[in-house]
Amino acid sequence: MVVVAAAPNPADGTPKVLLLSGQPASAAGAPAGQALPLMVPAQRGASPEAASGGLPQARKRQRLTHLSPEEKALRRKLKNRVAAQTARDRKKARMSELEQQVVDLEEENQKLLLENQLLREKTHGLVVENQELRQRLGMDALVAEEEAEAKGNEVRPVAGSAESAALRLRAPLQQVQAQLSPLQNISPWILAVLTLQIQSLISCWAFWTTWTQSCSSNALPQSLPAWRSSQRSTQKDPVPYQPPFLCQWGRHQPSWKPLMN
């Protein structure tokens, strides 16, 4: 057991008293259960700034030459116990902080899930309402289109009106019908002109192919006699072939090396 008694006034030079007791004391020769008083001298030469409560100076490491091995072991054990307890306290505080963070995050997650569910329900209701409005506006657009065709050339509604919005929100089937309507309005005489142009192109192409074939067949017999005459002239007067000049190999050559038998 270690008991530390601090001095009442740190400015005084009174020493501190350490009472050490335990099993090592009996091993050293002292009676068991008897405390060993130890006088530790206080810090001498303290500056007036430290005595008056000013900035503390850097404390030098105290030498333990005046302590016995048993006292040093007890001091080391005490320091280890204090350090372990401090580490446990820090770990416990950290774990409590993390647990509180987990609880807060779970509460926030539950709030977000509830808000997400409400937003999904609201979105579903808006989608259903949007589909109903699209259907209503599509029927109104058909009625307005029929009225516009019956009246003829009238002033079209300005952009941003209810009728223009209805025309933009028509069903896909109505859009397909609107795309096919220009093809149905083509007059028959335009189709007739297109067919006549296609027929004229076909006839021109047929005439061109027959004319080129006839020209090629007429030019072939005229070119055959000329080709045959040129072949005969080359056969009658052939160009004399002169063999290349071959330099003889002998002693006059610089690389002449006869074989020695």
Swiss-Prot record:
Protein name, as recorded: X-box-binding protein 1
Tell me the residues on which Phosphoserine occurs. S47, S68
Chain intervals for the UniProt region annotation (Leucine-zipper): 98-133
Gene Ontology biological-process annotations: adipose tissue development; angiogenesis; ATF6-mediated unfolded protein response; autophagy; cellular response to amino acid stimulus; cellular response to fluid shear stress; cellular response to fructose stimulus; cellular response to glucose starvation
Q: Relay the domain remarks.
A: Isoform 1 and isoform 2 N-terminus domains are necessary for nuclear localization targeting. Isoform 1 C-terminus domain confers localization to the cytoplasm and is sufficient to impose rapid degradation. Isoform 1 transmembrane signal-anchor domain is necessary for its own mRNA to be recruited to the endoplasmic reticulum (ER) which will undergo unconventional ERN1-dependent splicing in response to ER stress. Isoform 1 N-terminus and C-terminus regions are necessary for DNA-binding and weak transcriptional activity, respectively.
The record's account of tissue expression is: Expressed in plasma cells in rheumatoid synovium. Over-expressed in primary breast cancer and metastatic breast cancer cells. Isoform 1 and isoform 2 are expressed at higher level in proliferating as compared to confluent quiescent endothelial cells.
Q: Which organism is it from?
A: Homo sapiens
Where in or outside the cell? Endoplasmic reticulum
Where is the region Nuclear localization signal (NLS)? 75-92
Q: What does the similarity note say?
A: Belongs to the bZIP family.
Region annotated Necessary for the translational pausing of its own mRNA sits at: 235-261
Q: What is the effect of changing S255A?
A: Increases translational pausing of its own mRNA
Q: Which GO terms describe its cellular component?
A: cytoplasm; cytosol; endoplasmic reticulum; endoplasmic reticulum membrane; nucleoplasm; nucleus; RNA polymerase II transcription regulator complex
Q: What is the effect of changing S200L?
A: Inhibits HM13/SPP-mediated degradation of XBP1
Q: Which gene encodes it?
A: XBP1
Q: Region (Disordered) spans which residues?
A: 44-93
Which function does this protein serve? Functions as a transcription factor during endoplasmic reticulum (ER) stress by regulating the unfolded protein response (UPR). Required for cardiac myogenesis and hepatogenesis during embryonic development, and the development of secretory tissues such as exocrine pancreas and salivary gland. Involved in terminal differentiation of B lymphocytes to plasma cells and production of immunoglobulins. Modulates the cellular response to ER stress in a PIK3R-dependent manner. Binds to the cis-acting X box present in the promoter regions of major histocompatibility complex class II genes.
**Disorder:** Major affective disorder 7: A major psychiatric disorder that is characterized by severe mood swings, with fluctuation between two abnormal mood states (manic or major depressive episode). Mania is accompanied by symptoms of euphoria, irritability, or excitation, whereas depression is associated with low mood and decreased motivation and energy.
Q: What is the effect of changing R232N?
A: Induces glycosylation
Question: Where's it mainly located?
Answer: endoplasmic reticulum
Cite the residue spans of the region called Basic motif. 72-94
The listed outcome for L194E is: Reduces endoplasmic reticulum localization of its own mRNA
